[in-house]
């Protein structure tokens, strides 16, 4: 097992190094097809490293603001990858502006802002791996995870304090937001999906909904059991109550997503066992499988409307 863990965690470290290039390549302000970007550059924190935060405003933001409109807010991780493929390391993007604009203009969601929080490059895994999952790992696997993936610096709890105690108050002060959990949701993909669910569990009074696209429950980049089992124990004990909360989960079937089905199915059952309903008009849980799709921004962009509608549809 030790050899397997070292190999797996080495792959994680290699994958994380890609995001160093991502940070270097994405310094240019994104140019969305609709709406506009405000950048809070090098937003300082007492809890984690400073980073850019890109806030997307819809095309008619100023007119809506003048009319007294208040806005839903979606907090999204990996903020470098959300708006403009020309500024990303792999020339792919979620194209969030297109989806949100279309849903707003069709009246399916109320006016909405998107807060894109940049990841922290080499510390992405440290910030996005739910810290309390570590408590449910045996000493050997926990130490290997700490050394090889988290760089002996687990930061997920600090990252959430940054979001909740520093960033959200700044956003609420700067923009006419709807501040309550019913209008404040959080989402991401892969490790970003993992930290989104963790955020709602740890701060259920802040986030009323969480979405994980291709959520990376497996921890490493090969099938394994110890890291998912730690997540299951945490979810069993700490999942946000179903009253007033919504959860969205999905995965594809190719690339890294080809590993996800058994782990996601187990998570789905835990969520149902905790009282969430995925049937009927009162459904507060949705889980989907997208055949033939992989682990990339193009795939997530193509289905972004589904979680947004589920979490914020009116």
Task: Give each language-model segment a name.
Residues 1-12:
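Bacterial N-terminal signal peptides that target proteins for export
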Residues 10-21:
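Bacterial N-terminal signal peptides
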Residues 22-26:
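Sec/Tat signal peptide C-region and signal peptidase I cleavage site
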Residues 27-314:
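Non-catalytic cap/lid and distal C-terminal segments of serine-dependent acyl enzymes
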């Amino acid at each position: 097992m030790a050899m397997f863990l070292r190999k797996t965690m080495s792959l994680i470290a290699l994958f994380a190094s890609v995001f160093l290039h991502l940070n270097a390549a994405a310094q240019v302000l994104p140019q969305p097809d609709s709406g506009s970007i405000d950048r809070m550059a090098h937003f300082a924190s007492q809890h984690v490293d400073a980073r850019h935060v890109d806030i997307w405003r819809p095309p008619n933001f100023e007119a809506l603001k003048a009319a007294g409109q208040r806005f839903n807010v979606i907090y999204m991780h990996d903020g470098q990858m959300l708006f403009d493929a020309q500024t990303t390391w792999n020339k792919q993007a979620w194209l969030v502006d297109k989806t949100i604009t279309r849903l707003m203009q069709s009246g399916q969601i109320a006016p909405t802002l998107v807060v894109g929080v940049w990841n922290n490059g080499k510390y992405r895994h440290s910030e996005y791996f739910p810290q309390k999952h570590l408590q449910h790992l045996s000493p050997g696997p926990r130490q290997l995870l700490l050394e090889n993936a988290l760089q002996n610096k687990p930061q997920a709890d600090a990252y959430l304090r940054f979001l909740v105690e520093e960033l959200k108050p700044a956003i609420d002060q700067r923009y006419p937001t709807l501040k309550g959990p019913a209008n404040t949701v959080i989402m991401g993909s892969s490790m970003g999906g993992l930290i989104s669910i963790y955020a709602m569990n740890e701060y259920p009074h802040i986030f009323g909904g969480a979405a994980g696209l291709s959520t990376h429950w497996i921890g490493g980049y090969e099938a394994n059991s110890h890291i998912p089992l730690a997540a299951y124990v945490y979810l069993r004990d700490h999942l946000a109550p179903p009253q007033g909360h919504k959860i969205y989960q999905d995965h594809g079937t190719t690339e890294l997503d080809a590993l996800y089905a058994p782990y996601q199915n187990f998570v789905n059952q835990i969520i149902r066992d905790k009282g969430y309903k995925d049937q009927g008009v009162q459904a507060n849980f949705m889980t989907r499988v997208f055949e033939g799709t992989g682990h990339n921004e193009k795939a997530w962009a193509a289905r972004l409307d589904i979680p947004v509608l589920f979490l914020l549809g009116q």
